[in-house]
């Protein structure tokens, strides 16, 4: 089993691991010795990622799952449980989407879609994983939240609501599951350099909003996925055994500056 500052012998599930923040988290945990399972909606992306990870000697497996589907989530968790023989040390609820619109312009289909992936899937997978986390005798859940969960940002009312709900779920589960030796924490990214951000800044108005966010950061730059992944890994280390119910912001100092 792992020492204080590594994850040797640990099992980990990271949702949405084929790109961006999720990809960075998979690499970080695997590099620290964990056996990792991940998922994506795109088989081709997963195959390309698996080739890269295996060339680096990482122990990673993956399968396709549409996390907006309750039945697929249930089948996926059965697959993960079988792969790890019923014991899971780490669950990182990373998968999420954002739809940039004013709240009044959201359709109910938009609302249902973003809620189902960002909040319902994270909650449901956590509940499905609970017996396997408990069986490991040292479980960790990490929710990937956002500065949007605690700060009002343009065009992110519903996205921010999903992350605010996630933050409260983090605190509640930390108390409910402590008796099962499961710690629950959240990591709130600021602006992280991912393909999603690259697509967003193609819109001049969105680029202007993004530049304003970066200007409010103490470090005056975007973060890298590996910088966020390092904090996720820390929360999973045995050395972090007294940390639970916390939301840690990896935002270059944005929240320290009073938000937007």
UniProtKB/Swiss-Prot annotation:
Pathway(s) the chain acts in: Alkaloid biosynthesis; tropane alkaloid biosynthesis
Species assigned in the record: Hyoscyamus niger
Family matches, as SUPFAM superfamilies: NAD(P)-binding Rossmann-fold domains
Enzyme class: oxidoreductase
Matches recorded under InterPro entries: NAD(P)-bd_dom_sf (IPR036291), Sc_DH/Rdtase_CS (IPR020904), SDR_fam (IPR002347), TR (IPR045000)
Annotated catalytic residues: 159 (proton acceptor)
Record-listed substrate binding positions: 146
Entry GO MF terms: tropinone reductase activity
Phylogenetic lineage: Eukaryota, Viridiplantae, Streptophyta, Embryophyta, Tracheophyta
Name this protein carries in UniProt: Tropinone reductase 2
Single Gene Ontology BP annotation: tropane alkaloid biosynthetic process
Gene name as annotated: TR2
Gene3D superfamilies the UniProt entry points to: NAD(P)-binding Rossmann-like Domain
Residue spans crossing the bilayer: none
UniProt family annotation: Belongs to the short-chain dehydrogenases/reductases (SDR) family.
Keywords attached to this entry: NADP, Oxidoreductase
Catalytic reactions on record: pseudotropine + NADP(+) = tropinone + NADPH + H(+)
Function: Catalyzes the stereospecific reduction of tropinone to pseudotropine.
Annotated positions binding NADP(+): 13-37
């Amino acid at each position: 089993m792992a020492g204080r500052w590594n994850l040797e012998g640990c099992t980990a599930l990271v949702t949405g691991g084929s790109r961006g923040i999720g990809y960075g988290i998979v690499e970080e945990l695997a590099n620290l010795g964990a056996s990792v399972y991940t998922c994506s909606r795109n088989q081709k992306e997963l195959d390309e990622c698996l080739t890269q990870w295996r060339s680096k000697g990482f122990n990673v497996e993956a399968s396709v799952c549409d996390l907006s589907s309750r039945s697929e989530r249930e089948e996926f968790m059965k697959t993960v449980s079988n792969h790890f023989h019923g014991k899971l040390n780490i669950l990182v609820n990373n998968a999420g989407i954002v739809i940039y619109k004013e709240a009044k312009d959201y359709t109910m289909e938009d609302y249902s879609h973003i809620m189902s992936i960002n909040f319902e899937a994270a909650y449901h997978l956590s509940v499905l994983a609970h017996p396997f986390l408990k069986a490991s005798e040292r479980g960790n859940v990490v929710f990937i939240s956002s500065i949007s969960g605690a700060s009002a940002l343009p065009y992110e009312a519903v996205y921010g609501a999903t992350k605010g709900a996630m933050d409260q779920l983090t605190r509640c589960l930390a108390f409910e599951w402590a008796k099962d030796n499961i710690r629950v924490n959240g990591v709130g990214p600021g602006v992280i350099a991912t393909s999603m951000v690259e697509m967003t800044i193609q819109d001049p108005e969105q680029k202007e909003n993004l530049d304003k966010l970066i200007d409010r950061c103490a470090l005056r730059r975007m973060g890298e996925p590996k910088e966020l992944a390092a904090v996720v890994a820390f929360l999973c280390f045995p050395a972090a055994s007294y940390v639970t119910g916390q939301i840690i912001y990896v935002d270059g100092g944005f929240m320290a500056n009073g938000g937007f």
